[in-house]
């Protein structure tokens, strides 16, 4: 059976159980062909800025010796995560905007969901690790080099990734152990957990509980680490006599708190609530925001208010300007 819409045809394949499901159809935001072209252009520009901003920040940290410390190593890992996070979802979504074929293969859907959950969860843990790093640097700066040596921050980063992989494995196995009946249409732009559960004909109570308690536990743990770390940072700031020192700390920590608040706020809205409150159309917009828009915003949030990053960027621009000027004269 087919669904005819302006500009393209979407195939709907009736399925009886999970073994018959060889593909899914991602219905996306709209059937309007003109609007899809506009959405393609919008998200293409966002994705381009995301890659330039995040990968540029990674190269900046690698290339500038002044940024060779744990704080900026964590920031470069966050930027790499954001680039990967967006890349898992955006290219396929862009293709769907301009293609008649909106399908994604069953293995492709499994892979997309696994990577999406892996990078998303890893980012939650990494934001908590970054808060702890700021706490150590500000509350006990004399011991910072010892307490955040490579033997500490490298295992921390590995632990963040390990936690992300474990969490993704749980949900991927649980979700794709279900049967998918009647329709293979996913009312979403990518293979997220709630819309997949919505088209399953199996009992999804265990999956709903897993989603609520796993995501809820991760959110509680990581947010508590952030809150405790910043409570100690606040005490340290109140003891400071230097106004310049306070401004520098507020500049560094304010950007991190902004990023944490936006990211965790959208995740809590998406996953930590009763399944009866899910509205797939609204959730599609919110999930698009935190998978595509937030990765674009993070380089801006973390660089515009950071003096060291701005100086490193200024140094590169000045060097490139000088090189171009010399080349022009020659």
From Swiss-Prot:
PROSITE patterns: G_PROTEIN_RECEP_F1_1, G_PROTEIN_RECEP_F1_2. Keywords: Cell membrane, Disulfide bond, G-protein coupled receptor, Glycoprotein, Membrane, Olfaction, Receptor, Sensory transduction, Transducer, Transmembrane, Transmembrane helix. Disulfide bonds join 109-201. The keyword Repeat does not apply. It is found in: Cell membrane. Residues 59-66, 133-145, 230-249, 305-330 are cytoplasmic. GO terms for cellular component: membrane; plasma membrane. It comes from the Eukaryota. One of its GO terms (molecular function) is olfactory receptor activity. Glycans are attached at residue 17. Potential odorant receptor. Belongs to the G-protein coupled receptor 1 family. This is Olfactory receptor 5T9. It comes from Mus musculus. The gene is Or5t9.
């Amino acid at each position: 059976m087919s669904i005819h819409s302006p500009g393209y045809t979407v195939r709907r394949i009736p399925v009886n159980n999970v073994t018959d499901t060889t593909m899914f159809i991602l219905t996306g935001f709209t059937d309007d062909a003109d609007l899809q072209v506009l959405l393609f252009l919008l998200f293409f520009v966002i994705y381009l800025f995301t890659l330039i901003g995040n990968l540029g920040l990674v190269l900046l940290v690698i290339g500038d010796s002044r940024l060779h410390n744990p704080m900026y190593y964590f920031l470069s890992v966050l930027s790499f995560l954001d680039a990967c996070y967006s890349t898992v979802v955006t290219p396929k979504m862009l293709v769907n905007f301009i293609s008649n074929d909106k399908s994604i293969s069953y293995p492709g859907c499994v892979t997309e969901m696994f990577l999406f959950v892996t990078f998303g969860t890893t980012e939650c843990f990494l934001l908590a690790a970054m808060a702890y790093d700021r706490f150590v640097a500000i509350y006990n700066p004399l011991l910072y080099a010892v307490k955040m040596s490579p033997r500490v921050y490298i295992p921390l980063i590995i632990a963040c990734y390990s936690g992300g992989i474990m969490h993704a494995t749980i949900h991927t196995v649980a979700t794709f152990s279900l049967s998918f009946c009647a329709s293979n249409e996913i009312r979403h732009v990518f293979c997220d957990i709630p819309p997949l559960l919505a088209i399953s004909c199996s009992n999804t109570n265990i999956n709903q509980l897993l989603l609520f308690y796993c995501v809820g536990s991760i959110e509680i743990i990581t947010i508590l680490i952030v809150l405790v770390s910043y409570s100690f940072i606040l005490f340290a700031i109140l003891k400071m006599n230097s106004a310049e020192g306070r401004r520098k700390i507020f500049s560094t920590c304010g950007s991190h708190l902004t990023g944490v608040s936006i990211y965790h706020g959208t995740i809590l809205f998406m996953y930590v609530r009763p399944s009866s409150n899910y509205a797939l159309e609204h959730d599609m917009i919110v999930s698009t925001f935190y998978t595509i828009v937030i990765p674009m915003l993070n380089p801006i949030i973390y660089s515009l208010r950071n003096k060291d990053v701005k100086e490193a960027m200024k140094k590169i621009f000045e060097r490139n300007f000088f090189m171009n000027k010399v080349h022009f004269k020659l």
